[in-house]
Amino acid sequence: RLIRRQRQMCIRDRHCGHGRQLYFTSYGKEFVNSTLAYLELCKDTRFQSPGLELLQRLFTDGVQWIFYSKQHDPNNAGRFISSNQYSSAIKTLAERIYKLSSSDVRNSMKQALQHISGDNSLTGNRMFWRFDYMVHRRNNYMTSSRMTSTRTVGNEAGNGDGEFNYYASNGVNYLFVTGREYNGNFFKIFNNRQYPGITAEQDNAPLPIPDWGEGGNNGNSFAGGVSDSLYGACGMMLDRHGLQGHKAWFYFDDEYVCLGTGIRNPEGK
């Protein structure tokens, strides 16, 4: 089940925009807001749409997984990279969907709304295979692996936003414990060659700008993972502008393991 609109697509558990790029907290939010306006208008009429079920699944199977202590995984923000810029607006969308929901799905939407609102009781592991993206959750932390391949694109740049997002495609591994790790000015002052978990050259050369996702993918098709809904493992073969490496993550209960090997750059310093 999916909805397409130009270069955007809403698939059961995720929203993507400008190619297969995680983009829920900005473009996806507006996509849902526009769709909800029509669903609310047609409520209790003969024009009611089955599209409501798709939005419910989007939140129960996807959106609630990326929130921790009212913060969202920055991987889902596209070029507007942030962990909290649109959190309150997304909570409002969840409330509107909840009000439209029938009794058979009302409880699952209520739980999704609670998790978006700061309840961290959602635990498990989920592999979003269409986007080379894994989320792992326990009561006391949330983490994610954002891989890329020839099929997917990392955080883009455009209209002057996201001009330092190039390395956001290199295997970012965000970790939330307090929920305050990446809010405030974090993305304005951090070293753009040191996104959490990435493999990148540490030099002063100008960064390529991934305008509208151009150059934001990976040169190797190998990226993905496996999950039994509680534990998971994922990995990618990095190949970008001569930089190569094998990256993998293994997710357990009180710990997870990040491994890197075969790192090389024949053209590097």
Regions found by a protein language model. Give the residues of each.
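Single conserved hydrophobic/aromatic residue that forms the stacking wall/gate
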Residues: 1-7, 11
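Broad hydrophobic/π-residue packing in well-ordered secondary structure
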Residues: 3, 15-16, 27, 41, ...
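Aromatic-rich surface patch/π-platform used for binding flat ligands and interfaces
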Residues: 8, 24-26
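Acidic/His metal-coordination segments adjacent to aromatic residues that form catalytic metal sites
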Residues: 12-22
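Aromatic- and histidine-enriched alpha-helix N-cap/loop-to-helix transition segments
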Residues: 26-33
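Extended polysaccharide-engagement surfaces of secreted carbohydrate-active enzymes
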Residues: 31, 38-269
